């Protein structure tokens, strides 16, 4: 809207009235969109249209989540939970920024891909001993965990990986509830933070990295727009690696 406190702070993605296409307003699967102002346009350089479209969605979401981790010092470890499209994008962006995260998922194929791309280590969260293994690898516990699943089990897993004063950043929208004894929060000094997409400034920063060739492209699969129902079903079933791009 441009007028609410969030918009005035440059956080238009958190606009109080909200006008997001495909969420608040219809039009998420439209083949054309009217852009109301040039500030919403970004130079994609030589990147293909299909790949560039992923940066404005999963790319921006992953970049903003990583920024919320804040400055890291020697020995600070970051755990990425969920190696789907957004998680893989976060891995690529993290590597471009000199961060080598640990990746966690329940899919061995996705974990193998994450390891090939450069993850420091990968762990299957279906194995209940992996939290202990992460603690051994990190010399204690991790500083930050970013949860790209957003389920009760994944958040609890991330919390178990954190040291005192660490933070968990929740991106995923799977659902469920988190039951934590309130004294645990101040006594552990841990931070639980949500994040949703990202700001225009962050989008500009991300595209600078993209144009400079610092972010390796993730796997994308193009499908015609009339296959949207099947694409959503494949996403829900976990059959998609990387991102699906619909073409009208």
Question: What do these predicted ranges mean?
Answer:
Residues 70-74, 106, 112-191:
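Glycine-rich cofactor phosphate-binding loops and adjacent beta1-alpha1 units
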Residues 1, 29-30, 41, 59-62, ...:
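A general structural signal for well-ordered alpha-helical segments in protein cores
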Residues 41, 79, 102, 167-169, ...:
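Structural detector of well-ordered beta-strand residues that form the stable sheet scaffold
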């Amino acid at each position: 809207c441009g007028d609410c406190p969030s918009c005035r702070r440059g956080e238009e993605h958190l606009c109080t009235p909200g006008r997001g296409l495909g969420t608040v307003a219809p039009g998420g699967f439209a083949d054309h969109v009217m852009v109301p102002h040039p500030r919403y346009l970004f130079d994609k350089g030589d990147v293909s249209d299909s790949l560039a479209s992923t940066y404005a969605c999963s790319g921006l979401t992953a970049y903003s989540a990583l920024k919320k981790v804040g400055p890291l010092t020697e020995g600070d470890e970051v755990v990425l939970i969920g190696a789907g499209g957004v998680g893989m994008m976060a891995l690529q962006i993290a590597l471009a920024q000199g961060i080598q995260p640990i990746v966690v998922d329940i899919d061995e194929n996705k974990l193998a891909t994450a390891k090939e791309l450069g993850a420091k280590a990968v762990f299957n969260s279906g194995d209940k001993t992996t939290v202990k293994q992460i603690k051994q690898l990190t010399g204690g516990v991790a500083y930050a965990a970013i949860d790209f699943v957003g389920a009760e089990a994944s958040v609890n897993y991330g919390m178990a990986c954190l040291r005192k004063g660490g933070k968990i950043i929740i991106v995923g929208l799977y659902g469920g509830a988190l039951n934590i004894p309130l004294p645990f929060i101040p006594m552990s000094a841990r931070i639980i933070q949500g994040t949703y997409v990202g700001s225009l400034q962050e989008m500009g920063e991300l595209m600078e990295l993209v144009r400079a060739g610092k972010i390796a492209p993730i796997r994308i699969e193009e499908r015609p727009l009339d296959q949207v129902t099947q694409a959503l079903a494949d996403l829900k079933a976990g059959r998609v690696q990387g991102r699906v791009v619909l073409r009208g």
